[in-house]
Amino acid sequence: MAFLKKSLFLVLFLGLVPLFLCENEKREGENEKEENDDQSEEKRSLGSFMKGVGKGLATVGKIVADQFGKLLEAGKG
């Protein structure tokens, strides 16, 4: 009977150790995926910011061009 208990314990132990190792690897993989998601979110945020800056500069450029055009017309007349 003691032999069966030891065998059962050994089987359970050998079954749980790989399970534990697999779960650790799975957690590490999930953490890496979350880090990659965070980095891609930061890149998207930066892209949105740059897009907004570009639109703002375009608007300012139009205003400056209009004002410069008015100054040139006033100087001719």
Swiss-Prot record:
One of its GO terms (cellular component) is extracellular region. Expressed by the skin glands. InterPro entries: Frog_antimicrobial_propeptide, FSAP. Pfam families: FSAP_sig_propep. Keywords: Amidation, Amphibian defense peptide, Antibiotic, Antimicrobial, Cleavage on pair of basic residues, Secreted, Signal. GO terms for biological process: defense response to bacterium. The modification Lysine amide is found at residue 76. The keyword 4Fe-4S does not apply. It is found in: Secreted. It comes from the Eukaryota. Residues 23-42 form a propeptide. Residues 1-22 form the signal peptide. Belongs to the frog skin active peptide (FSAP) family. Dermatoxin subfamily. Possesses a potent antimicrobial activity against Gram-positive and Gram-negative bacteria. Probably acts by disturbing membrane functions with its amphipathic structure. This is Dermatoxin-DA1. The lineage of its organism: Eukaryota, Metazoa, Chordata, Craniata, Vertebrata.
